[in-house]
Amino acid sequence: MTLEEARKRVNELRDLIRYHNYRYYVLADPEISDAEYDRLLRELKELEERFPELKSPDSPTEQVGAKPLEATFRPIRHPTRMYSLDNAFNFDELKAFEERIGRALGREGPFAYTVEHKVDGLSVNLYYEDGVLVWGATRGDGEVGEEVTQNLLTIPTIPRRVKGVPERLEVRGEVYMPIEAFLRLNEELEEKGEKIFKNPRNAAAGSLRQKDPRITARRGLRATFYALGLGLEESGLKTQLDLLHWLREKGFPVEHGFARAEGAEGVERIYQGWLKERRSLPFEADGVVVKLDELSLWRELGYTARAPRFAIAYKFPAEEKETRLLQVVFQVGRTGRVTPVGILEPVFIEGSVVSRVTLHNESYIEELDVRIGDWVLVHKAGGVIPEVLRVLKEKRTGEERPIRWPETCPECGHRLVKEGKVHRCPNPLCPAKRFEAIRHYASRKAMDIGGLGEKLIEKLLEKGLVKDVADLYRLKKEDLLGLERMGEKSAQNLLRQIEESKGRGLERLLYALGLPGVGEVLARNLAAHFGTMDRLLEASLEELLQVEEVGELTARGIYETLQDPAFRDLVRRLKEAGVVMEAKERGEEALKGLTFVITGELSRPREEVKALLRRLGAKVTDSVSRKTSYLVVGENPGSKLEKARALGVPTLTEEELYRLIEERTGKPVETLAS
């Protein structure tokens, strides 16, 4: 077989295998047997081995259908920032958006807009060089996302190669799970006794972050694209409408609806029509995206710190559904607060099944006049939290029963006390309070002890191995090995995570300890103001009131907790266990999780730059691999640059590296370098 004959057959096989991948993984409707599929794949692999010049990173032999690939999810910096969108929730706010544009441009509307479905999925960025896909990443914080290239390549409509595009190109879009695929996936998970996803967006996000791309491929993910980052100027495009058609012509899926509108009134007409059709769409849409159609106006208007001035998300109103309140259960939180939770007849609202709703407190129930057996109107507050809007009293039959508050704690039986509107269990030994306190302490935003899940916390409490969070640091491997389903490796991993949690710093510790009214922001402010736990413990009420965002009620709650002998004893035992009680310097872990390689000559001594990177939490290695986050390129770079390009590793100039450090630390490099 000649090279040209092999090339022709290889291209035929790749197209054929991709088609059957689509039939099997996305449609779940294969046309050939597994044996026939394996034969095609084997033939392709043999030809690529025989003619190595025909190998390609976008070949099916490198993707799903070959041996399993391990996704790395390394941090990756977007060449240009990915912004969020500001929101409009009604026509008046849409009109205000148009008026702001008019003032900024110095001329009156109406303006021409492109209106697009706002698909509720996961934002992604595809980066191409010379028409070849180098990597794909999630949006992350807009500047740094996670690389998910291998999993994105399981979506058959994403082009691996494109022709006639700028040399460097970023294509932005949304990965989503169609409603039908979501319902099918949840049925499968339910049958296996596994945890189901709450909504299609969560399912898409969870599926895109699977370590085994073959699992991702079976989930039926789709993608739709709508924007360019790098390459927009070079494309020569004049309007957003042209851009969407250009994306389709280049082979990118544009699966969401779009239309052109004149002025806010024109947008409103499209919005109202699409709102009526919302539930007939194959995907979840939570509104429309309105963009000025003329791209030259984008450059004039620019961006705020978080969003473009030329675009806005016009959100659909929260969906409301009728259902029945079947019963009320009472839950005890980590502070002892007792919260009534309504159990509803399950109802599908805005993409997920709602079967529980918080009823907050006694006053809320009285004001709502809700009873067990009532028909209620439910929506999702902010599109997220289920909430009872009102009671449908016209549907009452007389069989409804008033909600009775318990006099004793539903968990420990201790008599409840009432503090204003709140019923509280005062028992310090209440198992529910202990459970919630430990669960909160171990949560990701607190001390981040990932291996300490709810079931394990329950077991530790049942066995008497822990009574509070300080006891976590006294756990030994022998204690854990005595627990059901706890092997040696799991025990070692948990103990390692507990040990690592000691160094999270004062900010995370204050949030983890659950001081009254102290969330993430207030914990940060307290840590920055006082610096150490000792200084905070000595603080007067007046000093607490000087902290940013601390009001009188919050200050009093914090002060009373700090003076509580039980709290002070807990802090003492945590300190004895080695938990860090000081605030971290900003930037101390600014580059944690990133791996750097340096090539070429820098303006500073290379060892000095390496030391700086390590001091900021980064790892520095001598060789480029797929695990490399960035290659820092100086003058006269070596072969590492070619390897980085081949592997799709992002590069930074020395100046870009220092800019990254300054952004992450908030300090000039000169003050950080030793």
From Swiss-Prot:
The entry's function note states: DNA ligase that catalyzes the formation of phosphodiester linkages between 5'-phosphoryl and 3'-hydroxyl groups in double-stranded DNA using NAD as a coenzyme and as the energy source for the reaction. It is essential for DNA replication and repair of damaged DNA.
Question: According to the UniProt record, what class of enzyme is this?
Answer: ligase
- Species assigned in the record: Thermus scotoductus
Ranges for domain BRCT come to 586-674
SMART domains named in the record: BRCT, HhH1, LIGANc
What InterPro entries does the database record attribute to this sequence?
BRCT_dom (IPR001357), BRCT_dom_sf (IPR036420), DisA/LigA_HHH (IPR041663), DNA_ligase (IPR001679), DNA_ligase_AS (IPR018239), DNA_ligase_CS (IPR033136), DNAligase_adenylation (IPR013839), DNAligase_N (IPR013840)
**Which protein family is named in the record?**
Belongs to the NAD-dependent DNA ligase family. LigA subfamily.
Which superkingdom is the protein from? Bacteria
Q: How does activity depend on temperature?
A: Thermostable.
Q: Which amino acids does the record list as binding NAD(+)? A: D34, A35, E36, Y37, D38, S84, L85, E116, R139, E174, K291, K315
Q: What does the record give as cofactor?
A: Mg(2+); Mn(2+)
Starting at the broadest rank, the lineage of the source organism is:
Bacteria, Thermotogati, Deinococcota, Deinococci, Thermales
Q: Name one GO cellular component term.
A: cytosol
* Keywords from the named record: DNA damage, DNA repair, DNA replication, Ligase, Magnesium, Manganese, Metal-binding, NAD, Zinc
Gene name per UniProt: ligA
Annotated catalytic residues: K118 (n6-amp-lysine intermediate)
> Annotated Gene Ontology MF terms?
DNA binding; DNA ligase (NAD+) activity; metal ion binding
GO BP annotations listed: DNA repair; DNA replication
EC annotation?
Answer: 6.5.1.2
Q: Which SUPFAM superfamilies match?
A: BRCT domain, DNA ligase/mRNA capping enzyme, catalytic domain, Nucleic acid-binding proteins, RuvA domain 2-like
Residues annotated as binding Zn(2+) are: C409, C412, C425, C430
Entry protein name: DNA ligase
Q: Which reaction does it catalyse?
A: NAD(+) + (deoxyribonucleotide)n-3'-hydroxyl + 5'-phospho-(deoxyribonucleotide)m = (deoxyribonucleotide)n+m + AMP + beta-nicotinamide D-nucleotide
Identify the NCBIfam families for this entry.
Answer: dnlj, PRK07956.1
